[in-house]
Every structure is written in structure tokens, then in C-alpha cells.
């Protein structure tokens, strides 16, 4: 993984290119992020930079985290994430990362937590076909058989069944940057990004 940045999903809109074509895009408020720590092979076993994002009141953080941030003279930051890389020579503690890292046309990977749908059934969660709705059928939205009989005498792990839908980490790869607004720290990315408006977004090259 190469260097990246944290941000917040603003929402979706449309963007018109030079030919007048309408492109569905997601607007992401990125950074500015602060490098709070640089990890090295000699001390940590791998090379990485730790990035902090979204300043909050000191009361929101515990003392160990505040002490860690004071070492890098960083303000109280709500989110800390790491980006592992081959070399950290181009970075230093307290360095500010913003939209300058990216260029129009560049492909990026975007990770976020998908929208939670709660406890969902077989049709909504796994796209099962439903049963007959009439002629005396009592099997409208049931799964049908979930296994064999005495042998194996159990339901195999991983069987598609009803349960929690969404609210898990999702990564969309190779999203193209359509436009960059450096004044307002906005990235405009072609396509959809996981999560609700306001969700934390992790971006990497």
C-alpha cells in the first residue's frame, strides 16, 4: 500500500465533462491530515506512516492517546490510521497531507463502512428466490432445506441465512478522480463510495 489520506463522504451529485456527458460522482471532503507517527523496520518491523484526521475537544480522547499525539505536537484528533509503504523517507512527523497528493485522472482505492440495513432475511440479504405466494403454500419467504439429515447432523458453517446486512468494511478499487477542488479540500470521484453521507472514508493510491 502507498500513501493515502482520510476524509468524509459528502454525498453524490453529477459532473459534466467537456463533451457535455453527465457523470455520476461522489464528493469527498479530504483532510487536511497530520502525520502523527512514522514507523520503521528497525523499531516496529515495518515501514508506515500514521495519519490523524478530524480535530476534536481534548475531553473526547483518553490520556494515553493525548500523550501519543503530544509527542508529534499534533492537536487532539479523532481518527488515526496507518498506511504501510516501502519507504518513509519523503515524510516527516507533523507534515500536513491534503489534496496535493492526488491528480485528476488518477485511480484510487476507497474504503468505508457500508450502510447498515439491520437484521435482514434470505431474499434481501442473499437474493434467494421466494416460494409460491398462493395455492395453499406456507413457504413464501423461507429458505428451504438448510442441510442433510443424520449425516452430517449439523448445519455447515457459512450457510447463507438471515442475519446482519451491511455495516461492514467495503473497499471499492480503481475509482477515477474526475476533479479536485483544492480550496475546499474536495475530491470528486467517478462512481459510488460505500457509506452514508458523513461517513469516514479511507483513501489510498
Swiss-Prot record:
It is found in: Plastid, Chloroplast. One of the primary rRNA binding proteins, it binds directly near the 3'-end of the 23S rRNA, where it nucleates assembly of the 50S subunit. Belongs to the universal ribosomal protein uL3 family. Keywords: Chloroplast, Plastid, Ribonucleoprotein, Ribosomal protein, RNA-binding, rRNA-binding. This is Large ribosomal subunit protein uL3c. The lineage of its organism: Eukaryota, Rhodophyta, Bangiophyceae, Bangiales, Bangiaceae. GO terms for molecular function: rRNA binding; structural constituent of ribosome. InterPro entries: Ribosomal_uL3, Ribosomal_uL3_bac/org-type, Ribosomal_uL3_CS, Transl_B-barrel_sf. Gene3D superfamilies: 3.30.160.810, Translation factors (2.40.30.10). It comes from the Eukaryota. It holds the Pfam family Ribosomal_L3. Residues 129-154 are annotated as: Disordered. GO terms for cellular component: chloroplast; cytosolic large ribosomal subunit. The gene is rpl3. One of its GO terms (biological process) is translation. Part of the 50S ribosomal subunit. HAMAP family: Ribosomal_uL3_B.
Amino acid at each position: 500500500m502507498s500513501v493515502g489520506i482520510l476524509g468524509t463522504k459528502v454525498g453524490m451529485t453529477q459532473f459534466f465533462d467537456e463533451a457535455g456527458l453527465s457523470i455520476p460522482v461522489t464528493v469527498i471532503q479530504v483532510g487536511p491530515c497530520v502525520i502523527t507517527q512514522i514507523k520503521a523496520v528497525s523499531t516496529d518491523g515495518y515501514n508506515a506512516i500514521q495519519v490523524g484526521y478530524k480535530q476534536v475537544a481534548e475531553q473526547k480522547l483518553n490520556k494515553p492517546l493525548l500523550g501519543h499525539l503530544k509527542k508529534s505536537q499534533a492537536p487532539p484528533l479523532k481518527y488515526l490510521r496507518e498506511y504501510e509503504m516501502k519507504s518513509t523517507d519523503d515524510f516527516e512527523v507533523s507534515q500536513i497531507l491534503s489534496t496535493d497528493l492526488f491528480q485528476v485522472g488518477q485511480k484510487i482505492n476507497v474504503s468505508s463502512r457500508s450502510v447498515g440495513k439491520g437484521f435482514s432475511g434470505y431474499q434481501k440479504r442473499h437474493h434467494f428466490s421466494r416460494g409460491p405466494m398462493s395455492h395453499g403454500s406456507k413457504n413464501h419467504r423461507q429458505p428451504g432445506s438448510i442441510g442433510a439429515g443424520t449425516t452430517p447432523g449439523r448445519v455447515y458453517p457459512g450457510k447463507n441465512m438471515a442475519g446482519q446486512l451491511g455495516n461492514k468494511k467495503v473497499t471499492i478499487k480503481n475509482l477515477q478522480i474526475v476533479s479536485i477542488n483544492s480550496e475546499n479540500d474536495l475530491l470528486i470521484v467517478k462512481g459510488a463510495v460505500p457509506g452514508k453521507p458523513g461517513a469516514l472514508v479511507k483513501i489510498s493510491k
